[in-house]
Amino acid sequence: MNKTLSIKENHLFRALYHRGKSAAGKTMVVYVIKRRNQPVNRLGITVSVKLGCAVERNRARRRIRETYRLNETRLKSGFDIVIVARKAAVDGPFELLQKDLLRLCDQLGMLEAESHE
């Protein structure tokens, strides 16, 4: 299983916003930069104060983190990833979150080619 580290430094978030590729969906926006010769992904999740009270923001963060964890093995490694939550991440169905994440990762070229064995 791939190990994912977390992004916590502000300058890394800003670098992804300015230089990274992005794709937007109903529940989230994903920003990505490919890192050279790195065996692991780094993930950062942001939720705006506009989304709601702390309970709702933390719920959105937990749901996105779990969606990523469940699909982590399908992603290529060596990326810095920032996911920005939208309102639908709080109260939308979990299946929508998963479909959205996989679709956006596919658009950004992060999905591993599936083997049909």
List each language-model region with its residue ranges.
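Positively charged, solvent-exposed patches that mediate nucleic-acid binding
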Residues: M1-E117
